[in-house]
């Protein structure tokens, strides 16, 4: 389910374009509907704000929106309102005390997308981690974390996996460096369990897992580094589709890219990585073989 994130972003994009075409500043736009320029800016950025349908209509009128564009914008506004009533929306915010500052934005995208493609060189993506694997990584990064905080973060990971297992319209394509399988996280028993889980979940119809073997010659993934590409569905009422977003995480923060040329660069990288990755069957066999090594 797209929730309110994607229609909000699409509405903001339309309002921004119309305001620029009308030659109005955010201050001028705010005066039209009696809000601050900051509210206009947040609305255009797809951030939740308190505005009414009447105010949106007035902006569209003053911007000189064509009837078709105005109809699209109002349909998006109605989608945002409808999604706000979904009790499942933003469930992860209950864990904000144990997550990073960029996690809310990441989860908005994860919950809204229908296809997630990720390339990982060091660790398994969160959606595929077992509790023991996740617990080990939390304590490596933050050895002083309280037991309660650690368990809450693990609980969050378990809840995130529900969509992967139950929503078959959600597609996850995972490319892993072989090194991910061989980095010993938590010891042999933890890794054996983790790789067994990886082999099992890779058989789900909506999950594709492919490993780039260490024998692969130099390939673009070594230069590009780790990333996640989010792709979104067509919105039900407006018929619009939001452009993809690329997420890149670093040790001290994260970057979100929306520029179309940047997105195309990452799409090309996905295609190049796919050229050197094992197919799903050979990947599963490798995962099981490495799991046996840990169990020996």
Language-model features: where?
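Interdomain hinge/linker segments and adjacent boundary elements that couple functional modules
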Residues: 2-13, 17, 21, 27-31, ...
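Short glycine-biased active-site loop of nucleotidyltransferases that positions the nucleotide triphosphate
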Residues: 30, 48, 219-222
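Conserved catalytic-loop position in the HRD/HxD motif
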Residues: 34
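C-terminal regulatory/effector modules of DNA-binding transcriptional regulators
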Residues: 165-169, 175, 181-296
